[in-house]
From Swiss-Prot:
Organism encoding this protein: Methanosarcina acetivorans (strain ATCC 35395 / DSM 2834 / JCM 12185 / C2A)
Protein name, UniProt field: Ni-sirohydrochlorin a,c-diamide reductive cyclase complex, component CfbC
Gene that this polypeptide is encoded by: cfbC
InterPro entries to which the protein is assigned, alphabetical: NifH/chlL_CS, NifH/frxC, P-loop_NTPase
Enzyme class: ligase
Residue ranges of coiled coil: none
Gene3D superfamilies the UniProt entry points to: P-loop containing nucleotide triphosphate hydrolases
SUPFAM superfamilies, A to Z: P-loop containing nucleoside triphosphate hydrolases (SSF52540)
Record lineage: Archaea, Methanobacteriati, Methanobacteriota, Stenosarchaea group, Methanomicrobia
Molecular-function GO terms, alphabetical: ATP binding; iron-sulfur cluster binding; ligase activity; metal ion binding; oxidoreductase activity
Origin: domain of life: Archaea
Length: 265
């Protein structure tokens, strides 16, 4: 029986989780893996670049409309065969997005259980600067077997990453690695590598800042589809391979605020 990788990618809002998740999904699918991406952000944009700019109905929106949701209503095939799902979020100012994720995932499992089992890699793109009770649901409910944190080398993204590590440890979830999505900060790779080591984990990849990523997104494409020969596409391919073969999991420690500030000076 094949070993299925089910990963959650956490990180500060705006750090590039959706971009990273969608490009890694595309890279792994190009390599012949069966891949599904499940967007858990109320913005519902995790899969948009895999679908050439098309927004898809979210599970929670359809449930609110009283639709008898079926697999064909919420699972769409994107670039390279990636299966795309958006959980959606609550109406603005009403309800908890984290609890909504639980409802959406449970619905998906009930209508697409066989499809979920067929996947080699499932990526949950999870929002939030902290791991609250709701957003940690994919982990706590056993839907996820690996967690990664995405950050850059600046203080605030590292502060968020540090809090996420603290939250994961509190619920007994090991961390599988740290990913640096560069903002072109000074000594960025060195800082994030040091952070990874000091919390007991590993730096999985350093993703350099490239304008082509934003250019592709504006046109509704992933880098893997629009610019497959770019250097950044190769970075995503290597990160995908690393995630697929990674076996390291540690109960991450967290750093003091003083240490974070010292590290990012």
């Amino acid at each position: 029986m094949k070993k299925q990788k089910i990963v959650a990618i956490y990180g500060k809002g705006g750090i590039g989780k959706s971009s990273t998740a969608s490009n890694v999904a595309a890279a792994c699918a190009e390599a012949g893996k069966k891949v599904m991406i499940i967007g858990c952000d109320p913005k519902s944009d995790s899969s948009i670049t895999l679908l050439r700019g098309k927004r898809i109905p979210t599970i929670l929106d359809l449930l609110r409309e009283g639709v008898d949701v079926q697999e064909k209503d919420v699972v769409f095939e994107g670039y390279a065969g990636v299966k795309c799902v958006e959980a959606g979020g609550p109406e603005p100012g009403i309800g908890c997005a984290g609890r909504g994720i639980i409802v959406a995932i449970q619905k998906l499992k009930s209508i697409s259980g066989d499809l979920l089992k067929e996947q080699d890699l499932i990526i949950y793109d999870v929002p939030g600067d902290i791991v609250c009770g709701g957003f940690v649901a994919p982990v706590r409910k056993g839907y996820v077997n690996e967690a990664y944190v995405l950050t850059s080398g600046e203080y605030m993204p590292l502060y968020a990453a540090n809090n996420i590590c603290k939250g994961l440890s509190k619920i007994g979830m090991p961390l599988s690695g740290v990913i640096c999505n560069s903002r072109n900060a000074s000594r960025e790779e060195e800082i994030v590598r040091k952070f990874s080591e000091e919390i007991g984990s590993q730096l999985m990849a350093f993703i350099p800042k490239r304008q082509i990523v934003q250019d592709c997104e504006r046109e509704g494409y992933s880098v893997m589809e629009k610019a497959p020969d770019s250097d950044i596409a190769e970075v995503y391919r290597q990160l995908g391979k690393s995630i697929l073969t990674n076996e390291k999991k540690v109960m991450a420690s967290h750093l003091s605020d003083e240490r974070l500030r010292e590290m990012t000076k």
